[in-house]
């Protein structure tokens, strides 16, 4: 769930934002972030003590004469801390050598405001509920696999972002985020056979650890791991694997920074057919399957727009700074300007597939013979402009024979073009899954897909 609120009568409702803006006479904006989290971890089939975390900080940007910008952040919200924050940002701006194209921040907006009756998160109650849910999940696994080992995590949080600027724009959004994942290993064989499942939702009932445990268990074949030689294989990619690839594509090719520096595939392929024509991908910040987030860190609405329209690549994501440099409107994709996100620039964080029609079983039937890859990790770029990445399969890599999962296979290193995978995609699953990181920053909503001729460059024995 999300709640978005404007300031009352155009005045800042957030006193922290007001206090900071009152200390400068220059164009400026403020982001005030408050986060409350519960994290429950599982290891060796045991529940670890829940961790409660509360964070509050602000970041401040200012433009001084000469169009020079400075940025500072702090967790000290005292008067002294705020004075230091503003002084530091203004000093940084005056020492900057590179003017920005942005001359002023946007004024009050007239966007539709969505009220969803978002309730405050009671972390104490959630901790009790999560512990019961985790115990039930562990019991489910123990009954199915008495010699199993379970690890995982459950996160629940409420995040409020308030953005205000010197031009009179004041917006805030509150989000509830629930995320969970489980790794199940069958220790009766050596090396252990593993299964993985995950999920994320803005609804507390949308992430159930027992249901995640069931999904992790249902595909584990009770056979020993067999090695598989490197080569080209037909593959059904699970949603977690596709989510990892979409996050890489977003960071490496769908943002304005990568277009500016010439490392994005969009430099050559914009408005051309780039992936399979039956695929349409959106940036959809309001998709109910995902983690709705109606505004960005500039305080602007994140636009619902097509990233690929029936295979044709569209334009990159923009924030205020990159949009000003090329004279186009922002798409509402600003990330926090401070590290570690500032170096990424604006990127889509809610990549959403239009669903296909195939069930999981139908995808395996169409695959016939090949590999089911549930998950990828350690994915890194080899050639950014060609979207070539390399990464390892992990936790749920199975050989499929005659359309059925037959046995687990040792992990493989995939070296492939992300666009090539999407270009050779033959079928798309009908079921969509939100696969978010633990804090809900990136939250793609993706299906399983069937792709032909995926290159695996090396293999392991485990």
Residue ranges: model-predicted function:
Residues 18-20, 47-51, 125, 137-144, ...:
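A generic local secondary-structure boundary/capping motif
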Residues 110, 269-462:
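Dual-mode signal for accessory low-complexity, basic/Gly-rich regions
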Residues 52-64, 171-199, 307-309, 395-402:
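Short beta-strand elements
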Residues 255-276:
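Amphipathic alpha-helical
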Residues 40-44, 158-176, 192-198, 245-251, ...:
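Short acidic, glycine/serine/threonine-rich loops at helix termini
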